[in-house]
A protein has these predicted regions:
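Structural detector for internal amphipathic alpha-helices that build alpha-solenoid repeat scaffolds
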Residues: 1, 10-11, 17-32, 41, ...
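Short inter-helical turns and helix N-cap capping residues of alpha-solenoid HEAT/ARM repeat scaffolds
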Residues: 15-16, 46-47, 76-77, 107-108, ...
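Terminal, low-structured helical/coil segments at or just beyond the last alpha-helical repeat
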Residues: 161-180
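HEAT/HEAT-like alpha-solenoid repeats
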Residues: 6-13, 37-44, 67-74, 98-105, ...
């Protein structure tokens, strides 16, 4: 039985979290652009369970929703930009790489961190310059994402980059430095 689009949109906009979760779980095969955009907008929901459900259904959706995800990378919402880059990576969707690269200088450190992680996961060798620059970001999580992305790409660090990571005095960097 097909659920009418209006009912889906009403339930997604509902303040009742149980109704939202119930509706979201039924949308893994949906390809309606309007519904997918509405689902993506829920990355700004206060409830982490809703955001997690959104992430899951978009990753599991086997339809070609690349264009919608790529368009969402220009959203005003840092959550939408960040999570859509990760979803493209989880879907192994290389179509979004050039669009994701543009977000390496995003105003949000959370978005930059996710973007660098996505580029590493996608093995985006054409983003090496941007990933290397991430080592010198002001945010420690962005540095970690950049370092991890470089390790996934089998890239070596310059002496200057090694010094920058060693300065962080963080066990995560020690592990990553051993890989690089």
């Amino acid at each position: 039985m097909t659920i009418p689009k209006e009912l889906i949109l009403n339930l997604l906009d509902s303040s009742n979290k149980n109704k939202q979760k119930s509706m979201l779980s039924q949308l893994t095969h949906n390809k309606d652009k309007g519904i997918i955009k509405n689902v993506i907008s829920l990355f700004d929901d206060d409830d982490i369970k809703i955001r997690g459900e959104v992430f899951s259904i978009l990753c599991l959706n086997e339809n070609d929703i690349s264009e919608i995800l790529i368009d969402s990378l220009t959203s005003k919402s840092k959550n939408i930009r960040a999570f859509c880059s990760l979803i493209l990576a989880n879907r192994n969707d290389a179509n979004g790489i050039n669009h994701i690269i543009k977000l390496t200088n995003d105003s949000s450190s959370m978005a930059r961190s996710c973007v660098l992680g996505a580029l590493g996961y996608l093995r985006a060798s054409n983003a090496m310059k941007e990933i290397h620059q991430g080592i010198f970001d002001s945010d420690v999580e962005v540095k970690k994402s950049a370092a991890h992305a470089l390790s996934l790409l089998g890239e070596k660090l310059s002496d200057k980059e090694k010094i920058e990571l060693e300065k962080q005095n963080d066990p995560d960097f020690e592990k990553i430095l051993k890989k690089l």
